[in-house]
UniProtKB/Swiss-Prot annotation:
The lineage of its organism: Bacteria, Bacillati, Bacillota, Bacilli, Bacillales. Pathway: Amino-acid biosynthesis; L-tryptophan biosynthesis; L-tryptophan from chorismate: step 5/5. This is Tryptophan synthase alpha chain. The keyword Electron transport does not apply. One of its GO terms (cellular component) is cytosol. One of its GO terms (molecular function) is tryptophan synthase activity.
Length: 258
């Protein structure tokens, strides 16, 4: 399915709620169980983090989750196997968030083959500059897997146009300077930034980094096409507060109907 499965998540004005889970945090059986829960709860897409020892874009919550996964001996191979098994039950799109090093260490051709086996629809590589994306972009295109672009508040218009013109899936618009993590509020210029990104791409635009309350979700989906919630989802899963995740999803759906 690949790119088409991601497109379907945004069809007919749908607003996407995209939770992030760290692959292997709590073990691979827990990963599968969380994927099933998020699918049943109504998540639009699930973003799965590949744990890495030098996660430069991750805030403290996601760093700790990655460290727990690595300390427990979780491997990229194991995460793929868990995804292969759970894909038989879960139909929503899978997007991997991985740094470049684990892809190259695994072998990029082999990594993409395993993505196909696991039904992965897209990949985000936060430390892969646009200028170097040919390292994996042609292989991903051939496999019909979207390489999801990231743009930031400081990205000039021309760069946003260039980055998004050849991309597929959706645009990940980073809403804060710095790393992921929980924030209290967003500056007014974030609204104009998101509107600017939307006006210069044919793809859906999803806001991420720092989104941690239902109010944030409601605010962001009035401007763009969806949200990624990472650190807060990890916290809620860890503390068994799943009903709050369902409330986030409901907040997204309500804006869809508004």
């Amino acid at each position: 399915m690949g790119v088409e499965r991601i497109k379907a998540a945004f069809e007919n004005g749908k607003k996407a709620f995209i939770p992030y889970v760290m692959g292997g945090d709590g073990g691979l059986e827990i990963l599968k169980e969380r994927m099933r829960f998020l699918d049943e709860a109504g998540a639009s897409i699930v973003e799965i983090g590949i744990p890495f020892s030098d996660p430069v874009a991750d805030g403290p919550t996601i760093q700790r989750a990655g460290k727990r996964a690595l300390d427990s001996g979780v491997t990229v191979k194991g995460i793929f196997q868990a995804l292969i098994e759970v894909r038989k039950e879960v139909q929503i799109p899978f997007v991997l968030m991985t740094y470049l090093n684990p892809v190259l260490a695994f072998g990029k051709e082999r990594f993409i083959e395993r993505c196909l086996e696991a039904g992965v629809d897209g990949i985000i590589v936060p430390d892969l500059p646009y200028e170097e994306q040919d390292i994996i972009a042609p292989l991903l295109r051939e496999a019909n897997i979207a390489l999801i672009p990231l743009v930031t508040v400081t990205s000039p218009i021309e760069r946003i146009k260039k980055i998004t013109s050849e991309s597929e899936g959706f645009v990940y618009a980073v809403t804060v300077a710095g790393v992921t993590g929980v924030r209290q509020n967003f500056k007014d210029e974030i609204h104009s930034y998101l509107e600017k990104v939307k006006s210069h791409t044919h793809l859906p635009v999803v806001a991420g980094f720092g989104i941690s309350t239902k109010e944030h979700v409601e605010e962001m989906v009035t401007i763009c096409d969806g949200v990624v919630v990472g650190s807060k989802v990890i916290e809620l899963l860890e503390n068994e507060k799943r009903e709050e995740i369902c409330e986030f999803i409901q907040a997204t759906k309500q804006k869809e109907e508004a």
